[in-house]
Curated annotation (Swiss-Prot):
Gene responsible for this protein: psaJ
GO-annotated cellular components: chloroplast thylakoid membrane; photosystem I
UniProt keyword annotations, A-Z: Chloroplast, Membrane, Photosynthesis, Photosystem I, Plastid, Thylakoid, Transmembrane, Transmembrane helix
Transmembrane found in the keyword field: yes
Protein name per its UniProtKB record: Photosystem I reaction center subunit IX
Protein backbone atom coordinates (compact mmCIF):
# COMPACT_ATOMS: atom_id res chain seq x y z
CA UNK A 1 0.00 0.00 0.00
CA UNK A 2 2.89 2.36 0.73
CA UNK A 3 4.29 1.79 -2.77
CA UNK A 4 0.97 2.79 -4.32
CA UNK A 5 0.91 6.01 -2.28
CA UNK A 6 4.49 6.75 -3.33
CA UNK A 7 3.56 6.22 -6.99
CA UNK A 8 0.49 8.42 -6.71
CA UNK A 9 2.55 11.22 -5.19
CA UNK A 10 5.40 10.97 -7.74
CA UNK A 11 3.33 10.71 -10.94
CA UNK A 12 1.68 14.17 -10.73
CA UNK A 13 5.03 15.82 -10.03
CA UNK A 14 6.72 14.12 -12.99
CA UNK A 15 3.82 14.83 -15.33
CA UNK A 16 3.76 18.49 -14.26
CA UNK A 17 7.50 18.81 -14.94
CA UNK A 18 7.16 17.02 -18.29
CA UNK A 19 4.21 19.10 -19.51
CA UNK A 20 5.87 22.29 -18.28
CA UNK A 21 9.04 21.50 -20.22
CA UNK A 22 7.01 20.56 -23.30
CA UNK A 23 5.00 23.79 -23.13
CA UNK A 24 8.20 25.82 -22.75
CA UNK A 25 9.73 24.08 -25.75
CA UNK A 26 6.66 24.77 -27.89
CA UNK A 27 6.63 28.41 -26.78
CA UNK A 28 10.29 28.84 -27.70
CA UNK A 29 9.77 27.18 -31.11
CA UNK A 30 6.86 29.53 -31.77
CA UNK A 31 8.97 32.49 -30.67
CA UNK A 32 11.73 31.74 -33.20
CA UNK A 33 9.44 30.40 -35.97
CA UNK A 34 6.08 32.17 -35.58
CA UNK A 35 3.08 30.61 -37.36
CA UNK A 36 5.21 27.86 -38.87
CA UNK A 37 3.06 25.11 -40.28
CA UNK A 38 6.14 23.62 -41.94
CA UNK A 39 9.43 24.14 -40.16
CA UNK A 40 12.05 25.86 -42.33
CA UNK A 41 14.96 23.77 -41.00
CA UNK A 42 13.67 20.49 -42.49
Amino acid sequence: MRDIKTYLSVAPVLSTLWFGALAGLLIEINRFFPDALTFPFF
